[in-house]
Amino acid sequence: MKKPILGSHVGMSKSNKHGEYLIGSVKEALSYEANTLMFYTGAPQNSVRTATDKLYIEEFNQLLKENNINKDHIVVHAPYIINISNPVNQTTWDFGVDFLKQEIKRCEDIGVKILVLHPGARLKGDYTDALNALVKGLNAVASSQTNVIIALETMAGKGTEVGLSLNDFKYVIDNVNEPEKVAVCLDTCHMHDAGYDFNNWELIKEEINKTIGKDKVLCFHLNDSKNPLLAHKDRHENIGYGYIGFDNLLKVLWDEEYIDIPKILETPYVEDKPPYKEEIENLINKNFSKKVK
């Protein structure tokens, strides 16, 4: 059987101890024995960005080639400050569209195809109005997308978030002008917190097939959850230490139907240290033996 495509969130900054910018991102992933990676192109909480020609793209490509990492499996995460589901504040929506266009351009420059985006929050607006604002926003950025596909992330339902249900994503995909430019990222913690029970992964797969279709799943965020089913909290837990459990996450990772889809760990650091090397080893060996805490 094929080996899963498994990596984690890694840094992408001048000060990464593994190396500057994209060089450090790949070297950090390799230190975890990962075969893919996810990074932000700048801080997730602000709009300050280093020009892409300073990110060592050529060296990045060379490192990927030398280490047999398929660039098509690499994921970029859009910053949290984009909210194109906001139906009540035009300024916020306009900023989100403009900044998302910039992020798309940066992904095009780097050559990464998968851009994960949080759908956003409705604030005081109506839920359907928020989904329509999201559709409008995705239509507004579509002309910027040449190779990049936006993968909307499933959300936990914290506050006024939209995108809790696979039906939300079906609605968006059905209504955008260019559906081929929109896909989905399944976050296991968020889905669990929104009410999807990973004790029955087969049932979740049926729901995927009935709504968005499995071809629309571009990546997974593989996380355990600190909270029980339907908690709407969004607090990630280390693999095997939460309410989803090691065996259930193993089923997702090794599922033959999704074996070629990248899975990304976003689990918490333990005592300021990344747990990813141990978590990847446990998941690949199908053995919960390396304790991270």
UniProtKB/Swiss-Prot annotation:
GO terms for molecular function: deoxyribonuclease IV (phage-T4-induced) activity; DNA binding; DNA-(apurinic or apyrimidinic site) endonuclease activity; phosphoric diester hydrolase activity; zinc ion binding. GO terms for biological process: base-excision repair. Its EC number is 3.1.21.2. It catalyses: Endonucleolytic cleavage to 5'-phosphooligonucleotide end-products. Zn(2+) 2 binds at E153, D187, H221, E266. The keyword Metal-binding applies. Zn(2+) 1 binds at H77, H118, E153. Belongs to the AP endonuclease 2 family. HAMAP family: Nfo (MF_00152). PANTHER family: APURINIC-APYRIMIDINIC ENDONUCLEASE, ENDONUCLEASE IV ENDODEOXYRIBONUCLEASE IV. This is Probable endonuclease 4. It comes from Mesoplasma florum (strain ATCC 33453 / NBRC 100688 / NCTC 11704 / L1).
